[in-house]
């Protein structure tokens, strides 16, 4: 499709492509240009597209079934009010989950798609064509959001089904989908803006995630610190989650009871305008930012004059016994702006610390944890996601730069390669690990946590750090495409956290009748186990990985129930066993054989 204007069907197959004068003045059929046209034509040809679409609908129905069993169990429900109450509850859960998924994967797909073009040096080829800035930027943006938009439309019948139960109006459903679509465009525009600006994949992913967290955190901070002001009203308008909350509870602010009063027009328009601003800047600066002027910096040299002659001497550095970890630690393998990302994480940590930890600690978030615990949890999850992104890009960058295959010709062993990558990841992200540990120490000094509980919490968090790093390396080695590796790795982390959060909500809802409704949670956990096993055993069908993928959701469920029952040691042990065993199950195959570590096992050769 991209080379279509250069093709002359009248020419012989033995001739080169001929460029006609009219092809230089071509007019694309779509305003996004041939990049989006190609994606729209090729995406439906992939079997994976239909599997993802049907799998997403299946997940929604599993979640709906679990919520129904949690609410009613095996009772014979005949009351209209009970059905309407369940319809409203199910709408709130599904809408919140969909908005969260849409925002995350819009950001992930857009950032990963453009970053892969840069890593493979194919973006420069696009810049050398007669494609305009608008066609490149909008084409990559809309092509990245095509899968997300398909999933949003595919889920519409599920939400319409909830209307038949009562408790939700069709207007609420439409506005909820409008907010989801606008949020997807906003997060995708932000990720595209960052991806065209930054050079390294890790910088792109980390800046995109930190920017989104800072955006949402700033809006919530304005609402919390200046309630009732114009700034708070604008912050509520620009926040996707607050817009969705107003759609879910239209009577919360004393609005009229008619369905026509439900509207999120201001929020949708505001997010679309902000998206247009980000996209417009990217279109205007595309060929200024790319290619980067820093790509062709010469190595450090010094000139010496002897007998009137000038010689240039290149400064060589001493390399360690393990060159992999030396490169990860002693060079700028991930760009020159990594320190800025660490400072941004520190700023986010400071804002969360000020807003939630130093705030009113008596308020319970969803009746589960205090504001201080919720702040720590959010900061820890952000750190784990960034560590995982660092790990998976450490492998995908090598593959895209065609340097991973060169390792086969060297004497570097699999252990040196894998341990070197893991050591570099943990060293480069040491601040992301230390800051939550320091906050745990602050909890102990304030008397919020006992010394015993703080030790359990620190051990559990360090275990999750190792799991996040190893999962990134495992996904990077197991997938041949960088986009698939990044999506699989970060998607697994994201689904684990979202699944845990939803499971905790359902457990609180079914606290009074948990014993009789365990089968509903069993279905939810089994679905998660199947997805995790498929993700972990994509390239290496190891029995240990199958066992780890099957046990991890069940042990996580046990840790959640133990936590809600005020358990401490049991929670720590279940987390260490579940995630520690999974980490070891991913590590051992990677360091056992060099072919396996490079993702080229004998299974691929038949």
Where are these regions (language model features)?
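Transmembrane alpha-helical segments and their membrane-interface loop/helix boundaries
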Residues: 1-105, 112, 147, 151, ...
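Helix-loop-helix units of permease transmembrane domains in multi-pass membrane transporters
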Residues: 36-37, 113-145, 324-329, 395-428
């Amino acid at each position: 499709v991209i080379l279509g204007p250069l093709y002359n069907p009248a020419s012989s197959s033995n001739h080169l492509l001929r460029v006609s004068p009219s092809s230089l003045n071509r007019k694309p059929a779509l305003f996004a240009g041939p990049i989006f046209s190609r994606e729209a034509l090729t995406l439906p040809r992939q079997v994976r597209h239909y599997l993802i679409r049907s799998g997403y609908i299946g997940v929604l129905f599993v979640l709906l079934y679990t919520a129904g069993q949690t609410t009613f169990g095996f009772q014979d429900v005949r009351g209209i009010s009970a059905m309407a109450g369940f319809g409203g509850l199910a709408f709130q859960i599904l809408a919140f989950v969909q908005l969260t998924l849409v925002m995350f994967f819009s950001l992930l797909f857009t950032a990963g798609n453009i970053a892969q073009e840069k890593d493979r040096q194919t973006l420069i080829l696009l810049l050398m064509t007669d494609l305009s800035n608008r066609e490149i930027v909008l084409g990559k943006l809309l092509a990245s959001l095509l899968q997300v938009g398909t999933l949003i439309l595919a889920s519409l019948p599920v939400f319409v089904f909830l209307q038949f139960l009562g408790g939700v109006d069709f207007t609420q459903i439409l506005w909820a989908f409008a907010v989801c679509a606008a949020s997807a465009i906003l997060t995708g525009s932000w990720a595209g803006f960052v991806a065209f600006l930054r050079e390294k994949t890790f910088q792109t992913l980390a800046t995109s995630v930190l920017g989104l967290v800072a955006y949402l955190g700033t809006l919530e901070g304005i609402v919390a610190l200046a309630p009732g002001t114009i700034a708070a009203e604008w912050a509520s308008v620009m926040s996707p989650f607050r817009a969705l909350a107003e759609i879910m509870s239209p009577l919360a602010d004393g609005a009229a009871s008619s369905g026509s009063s439900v509207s999120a027009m201001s929020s949708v328009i505001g997010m679309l305008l902000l998206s247009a601003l980000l996209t417009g800047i990217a279109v205007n600066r595309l060929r200024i930012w790319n290619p980067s002027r820093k790509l062709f910096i010469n190595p450090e040299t010094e000139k010496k004059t002897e007998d009137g002659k000038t010689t240039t001497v290149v400064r060589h550095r001493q390399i360690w016994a393990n060159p992999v970890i030396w490169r990860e630690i002693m060079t700028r393998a991930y760009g020159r702006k990594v320190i800025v990302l660490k400072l941004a994480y520190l700023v986010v940590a400071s804002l969360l610390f000020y807003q939630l930890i130093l705030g009113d600690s008596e308020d319970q978030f969803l009746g589960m944890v205090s504001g201080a615990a919720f702040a720590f949890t959010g900061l820890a999850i952000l750190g784990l996601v960034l560590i995982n992104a660092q790990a998976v890009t450490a492998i995908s960058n090598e593959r895209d730069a065609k340097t991973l295959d060169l390792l086969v010709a060297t004497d570097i062993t699999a252990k040196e390669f894998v341990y070197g990558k893991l050591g570099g990841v943990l060293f480069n992200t040491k601040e992301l690990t230390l800051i939550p540990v320091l906050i745990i120490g602050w909890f102990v000094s304030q008397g919020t946590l006992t010394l015993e509980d703080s030790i359990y919490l620190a051990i559990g968090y360090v275990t999750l750090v190792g799991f996040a790093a190893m999962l990134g390396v495992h996904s990077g080695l197991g997938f041949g495409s960088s986009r698939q590796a990044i999506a699989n790795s970060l998607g697994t982390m994201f689904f684990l956290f979202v699944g845990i959060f939803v499971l905790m909500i359902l457990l609180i809802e079914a606290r009074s009748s948990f014993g009789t409704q365990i089968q509903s949670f069993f279905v939810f956990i089994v679905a998660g186990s199947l997805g995790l096993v498929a993700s972990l055993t994509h390239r290496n069908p190891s029995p240990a990985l199958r066992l780890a993928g099957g046990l991890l959701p069940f042990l996580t469920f046990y840790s959640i129930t133990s936590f809600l029952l005020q358990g401490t040691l049991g929670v720590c042990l279940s987390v260490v066993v579940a995630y520690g065993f999974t980490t070891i199950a991913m590590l051992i195959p990677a360091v056992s054989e060099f072919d396996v570590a490079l993702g080229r096992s004998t299974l691929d050769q038949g």
